[in-house]
Design a protein with these regions (language model features):
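Short, glycine/charged-enriched secondary-structure capping and boundary segments
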Residues: 83-86, 110-113, 189-190, 222-226, ...
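Active-site beta-strand/loop signature of hydrolases that rely on acidic residues for catalysis
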Residues: 67-74, 84-108, 173-177, 196-221, ...
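Structured beta-strand-rich core segments of catalytic domains in phosphoester-bond hydrolases
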Residues: 33-56, 95, 99-171, 267-268
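A generic local structural motif
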Residues: 56-57, 81-85, 119, 160, ...
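Soluble catalytic domains of enzymes that build or remodel membrane lipids, polysaccharides, and related
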Residues: 78, 105, 126-128, 132-204, ...
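Boundary/entry segment of secreted carbohydrate-active catalytic domains
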Residues: 37-81
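Active-site-proximal beta-strand/loop segments in catalytic clefts of secreted hydrolases
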Residues: 72-75, 99-101, 120-123, 136-138, ...
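Metal-dependent phosphoester-hydrolase catalytic domains
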Residues: 2-55, 200-207, 215-284
Length: 284
């Protein structure tokens, strides 16, 4: 390799890293298009989580009506057609849990029936923030975010949790997560999963944990299944099942507690490298 080529490669790497900003803890924002709701920070569990509660009371969710959920890794909006797909689901969905969402997608403006967005970003590249986004009609009672760094890349993988009051006096916890990917021995993977499950120690009655779990080998699948079973969650099965697979293992999952599936489907699409999951749930 010539000295010139080596210097060129180093210059490109330096440029990329100078354009990259890492957020640890995650940069977390609540954006509402309908109301001027503000949140104040507080410590709910431990210092590993950044938590916020609203200045105003949140509206309750009905437990007599089905809860409809879309979960999708949107691949940073790099593929044609993602806007149309989200708009097609908007009318029949109460919550959208998106991974690899970005600030440039302007999701609250696009999805006017989903005016409330929680966005937890692990990094920004050239002023484009990227992370997980939870969109809904409902404002949370409180929310938390956390991240664990990818071992090889050092880029934080984020998760955001939100708690909603139910009309029966109980609470619903929703966790939207994008799990560690680039690691052969799943040390950081376990750490991130422990961080997620820690939140189930709080007083919640119904739980949804969903997202891109990057469970691409048998060891990761077993770690994931054991931890979910430990906390009483069960996995949703899909028909048809068109989830993205690696080594024949699906990467995307939905786990629930205190709810049961009425229907659960996936859709083939070219609007992302992942296919969306949609589920209709009833409270137990």
């Amino acid at each position: 390799m010539s000295v010139f080529l080596l210097m060129l490669i180093l210059a490109v790497i330096l440029f990329l890293y100078q354009s990259l900003t890492l957020y640890q803890p995650p940069l977390t924002q609540f954006i509402s298009m309908n109301e001027k709701q503000s949140f104040e920070p507080f410590v709910e569990i431990d210092s590993k989580l950044s938590c916020y509660r609203p200045m105003l009371d949140a509206e309750t969710i009905s437990t007599t009506q089905p809860l409809k959920l879309l979960v999708w890794n949107v691949h940073k909006g790099e593929d044609k057609g993602w806007q149309s797909l989200l708009l097609n689901y908007e009318e029949k969905t109460d919550f959208m849990l998106l991974q690899e969402a970005t600030s440039l997608q302007k999701l609250p403006q696009l999805l006017q029936r989903m005016p409330n967005q929680l966005f937890a970003s692990g990094f920004s590249y050239r002023d484009m923030q990227s992370g997980v986004a939870t969109l809904s009609l409902f404002s949370p009672q409180y929310y938390c975010s956390a991240a664990v760094d990818e071992p090889w890349l050092g880029i934080p993988k984020t998760g955001v949790s939100s708690v909603y009051p139910l009309d029966n006096g109980k609470f619903l916890l929703i966790i939207n997560v994008h799990m560690i990917n680039f690691e052969w021995t799943p040390t950081a993977y376990r750490q991130q999963l422990e961080q997620i499950m820690q939140q189930l120690e709080q007083r919640v009655d119904a739980v949804i944990i969903a997202g891109d779990f990057n469970a691409w080998n048998q060891e990761r699948v077993e770690i994931l299944q054991q931890k979910m079973e430990q906390f009483g969650l069960h996995e949703i099965s899909f028909f048809p099942d068109n989830r993205l697979r690696f080594n024949d293992f699906p990467l995307d999952h939905i786990f629930v507690k205190g709810l049961k599936a009425i229907s659960a489907t996936t859709q083939k699409t070219k609007a992302s490298d992942h296919n969306p999951m949609w589920v209709e749930l009833a409270f137990d």
